[in-house]
A protein has these predicted regions:
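Conserved small-residue
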Residues: 6, 24, 97, 139, ...
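Structural signature of cysteine-dependent C-C bond-forming condensing enzymes
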Residues: 85-96, 114-124, 138-148, 171-178, ...
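Condensing-enzyme catalytic core mediating Claisen C-C bond formation in acyl metabolism
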Residues: 2-5, 17, 22-36, 42-44, ...
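Active-site pocket-shaping loop/turn-to-helix segments
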Residues: 58-78, 123-131, 149-161, 206-222, ...
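Conserved beta-ketoacyl condensing-enzyme motif
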Residues: 4, 32-153, 272-288, 303
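ACP-dependent fatty acid/polyketide chain-elongation machinery
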Residues: 1-62, 228-236, 326-341, 386-389
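Glycine-rich phosphate/pyrophosphate-binding beta-alpha loops
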Residues: 12, 103, 155, 285, ...
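Glycine-/small-residue-rich "gating" segment that lines the acyl/pantetheine channel
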Residues: 120-123, 164, 185-231, 245-247, ...
Length: 389
């Protein structure tokens, strides 16, 4: 069995685990608010940002200076002691880094292009900053590791797949530990891109709400240290699938998502009735919430409490999988109440197939949580975490 030895996280809920746990319990995200300068033709857009100072990247790593890598360092700092112990125990060549991202340092590239367009000097930009492989390369260099290091980019399931890949490397005997997770930061291109697709909500996103109008984009980073060393929280099972149906729309019957969840349950040797909570992908787009409701209804009916936390973190794109898996771990680790779905801006959509969406916080009845990530292109990943004796 693969265990989660440590976790670090930063997003609109807070800059460390204590802040995130407190605000998750309150149902309040300090970083979620209207922000200016991001959406072309609009004075403001509701975005979920990270506030406060971030770690500086020294001159030695100047080619990797991006906000994406800064928030990765902020997440890493929260599990640095456990990472140091793993390096001492296993050696630098026996630790992998597998990360997920959708945009990497795209914001820095965008800033560079704007400066050059207006014939202004651009002195801090390096091409490596916007490469998709840069987050894992940077972290590997930062920690002076010699094990496998690579980045996955499968849209919104990127970091969920990074968790699965890290587990696979350990099970294959290629490494003894894996630092897994991902990061994405606010960037004008995806914000304006989702707006052009009519998928960016003009207000705070409303997952499973009647008047839902699209996603709220957020930024964040999360990291987990996976090992075989027994810990209170384990990675019980995983599942992956591809719809092979459409470039952006999910399969109309959720066939790929159902396969991913069933794979995870089979891998964990569990049944749907063993699951105590489902952290839904719940993006608040019309199609995602409709299809995910079909999927959850088909497999779990209304028996299992579920909710989306994207009204608190925003959709952190490539970091969504690690963000929601880490939130699930926090619930298990600290016995937090399950986060309720907020229907204050829009009533629940009565046309969606019924599932166990909770509207008030409640305790976790069974110590197993399913975290789903269903990405563009039908790229699906499901992860089961649980407390173990």
């Amino acid at each position: 069995m693969i265990y989660i030895s440590a976790v670090g996280m930063i997003n609109a809920l807070g800059n460390n685990l204590d802040e995130i746990a407190a605000n998750l319990t309150r149902g309040s995200a300090p970083g979620m608010r209207p922000r200016a300068g991001w959406l072309q033709g609009h004075p403001q857009a509701v975005l979920a940002g990270v506030d406060g100072e971030l770690p500086l990247i020294p001159e030695k790593f100047a080619a990797h200076r991006s906000r994406n890598n800064q928030i990765l360092l902020a997440a890493l700092a929260q599990l640095q002691p456990q990472v140091d112990d793993a390096i001492a125990k296993y050696g630098r060549e026996r630790i992998a880094i597998v990360l997920g991202t959708s945009t990497s340092g795209l914001h820095e590239g965008d800033t560079h292009v704007n400066l050059r367009t207006h014939e202004q000097p651009s002195t801090t930009w390096h091409y490596a900053q916007q490469e998709l492989g840069d987050p894992s390369r940077f972290l590997s260099h930062w920690l002076a590791l010699d094990g496998p290091a690579y980045t996955l980019s499968t849209a919104c399931s990127s970091s969920a797949r990074a968790i699965i890949s890290g587990r696979r490397l350990i099970e294959a005997g290629l490494v003894d530990a894996a630092i897994v997770g991902g990061a994405d930061t606010l960037s004008r291109m995806p914000i304006n891109g989702f707006h052009s697709l009519e998928s960016l909500s003009p207000t705070l996103c409303q997952p499973f709400g009647r008047d839902r109008a699209g996603i709220t984009i957020g930024e964040g980073a999360g990291l987990m240290l996976l090992t075989r060393e027994p810990q209170p929280i384990a990675l019980l099972g995983v599942g992956e699938s591809s719809d092979a149906y459409h470039i952006s729309a999910p399969h109309p019957h959720g066939e790929g998502a159902i396969r991913a969840i069933n794979q995870a349950l089979t891998d964990a040797q569990l049944t749907p009735d063993d699951v105590g909570y489902i952290n839904l992908h719940g993006t608040a787009t019309q199609l995602n919430d409709q299809i995910e409701s079909i999927v959850v209804n088909a497999l779990f009916g209304e028996r299992v409490p579920c909710s989306s936390t994207k009204h608190l973190t925003g959709h952190t794109l490539g970091a969504a999988g690690i963000t929601e898996a880490a939130i699930s771990m926090l619930i298990l680790q600290r016995d937090l109440p399950l986060p309720a779905q907020d229907f204050s801006l829009s009533p629940r959509d009565p046309t969606l197939p019924p599932c166990g969406i909770i509207e008030k916080p409640q305790p976790l009845a069974r110590p197993v949580i399913l975290s789903n990530s269903f990405a563009f292109g039908g790229n699906n990943a499901s992860i089961l975490l649980g407390r173990v004796s």
